[in-house]
């Protein structure tokens, strides 16, 4: 029989030998180890410094992740982007970046576009924290990244093989300000996000999401450069808060009318991704997600992070989700208790904890990434198709359809052909009298 010290030494050696053969993901620093609690725990809100410390550890520990400095913030912090994919994709990421750029610029013919779409990887942008008092955004970013680098289930591995995910913190300065403000008191029950002492973006505060066409702030410039001159993601997902009262989240599709100035593959692409999100929420028994006229969000505001993406032929997504590290209540709203087209799975009034908002955000992210994986080639090819459509329209005369112009056409027809009647229709040869009326 071995003496105890000798037995202990052999046991330790056996454990070390076994762990040496494990993949990097098996030895990752967990949220519990890093923060002392799970992400989304009540009354806890890690700041940007804590996020960076953890991401730097994970980047050193995992072969699924690289941490990239994309520039300075208004207050001089480093703004980081985490690139997450399979180890093989990360080793060859420059080639995949160039493929995405080539397709987005639409400077190749159809045969080349098909070939590049088969060879390339879908690129998906997920950001968080732009409006820093909407604290879920940055926290869900941390949790989703953690799940992608730590899980080894078939779906996650497939996503990592097919997709390159860009996790971008949109407002590092604001996260430090808001998190430090919330946790300034040791009395958990007194913690509050109210009465922030200053703007959470040094110069423009909440209007940092009005800056993506003017690009006046360093954070905006950093992100626009990555999106529109470096990586050209096919999908841009912008997380916000808060959800409509009596629900948990608003998710696409957006309300009508959609912006008819965009390529039709934009609204149909948004609808495709939105359907995947809602279907996954229902399948995971997560009620309370509304769409379309469940809130007033649309494709019309042109200065925001996800809406400027439409002008670059990218599928821009927005979700608005409830949640705070201080528990809240979902109120009873009678009009939101009966299932309908824009709220197929209502939620009952109840106490709500921050961790559940994290879980909903992860579900939404995984729905997007799963779809990008399954339709990788189509997303790559369609951004090329939209680019070619734009080049063609810009290279020849065309009639842009606007409501006012259509009204002018109707008035002109009525003035020139008053005898035609209300049911006349215009055809290439002229008006047709007595066209069928409504049935």
PLM region spans:
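Bacterial N-terminal signal peptides that target proteins for export
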Residues: 1-11
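Bacterial N-terminal signal peptides
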Residues: 9-19
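Sec/Tat signal peptide C-region and signal peptidase I cleavage site
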Residues: 20-24
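Structured catalytic-domain cores with a bias toward divalent-metal coordination
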Residues: 25-439
